[in-house]
């Protein structure tokens, strides 16, 4: 299972001109299952709600329904506190990483280099060619 950080989901759904197609192609090319947390859902929906865009909001929720929803029980928050203290991560970043670790995900795809440094190999800046065996995500 690969945990998707909110930034990649946003690039995909909002069809970011530079990254949206790359994210879509990588997901389509992968045999892995993809998971997201309630935090990813929260972060993704903010822009659509703020702009009053129900079509975009629906596009996000339709994608959420096709991904594995990963719960965030109390141990995730306790691990996030450890990660914040040890690596100076912001709370949302620490929660993403802790959730991926808790669910024993094989990878956490992100574009955040701070997560790649703190994760000891779990998180990968998926928009860099070396992060997925030499191919761009």
Regions found by a protein language model. Give the residues of each.
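Active-site charged/polar residues at nucleotide-handling catalytic sites that mediate phosphoryl
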Residues: 30, 87, 103
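Conserved SAM-binding loop
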Residues: 12, 69, 89, 108
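Short, well-structured N-terminal submotif of metal-dependent ribonuclease cores
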Residues: 1-36, 48-59, 126-137
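Alpha-helix capping/helix-boundary segments
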Residues: 8, 40, 76, 96, ...
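Short beta-strand scaffold positions
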Residues: 4, 35-36, 71, 91, ...
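Acidic catalytic patch
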Residues: 66-86
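Acidic, PIN/NYN-like endoribonuclease modules and their adjacent C-terminal/linker elements
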Residues: 1, 66, 97-137
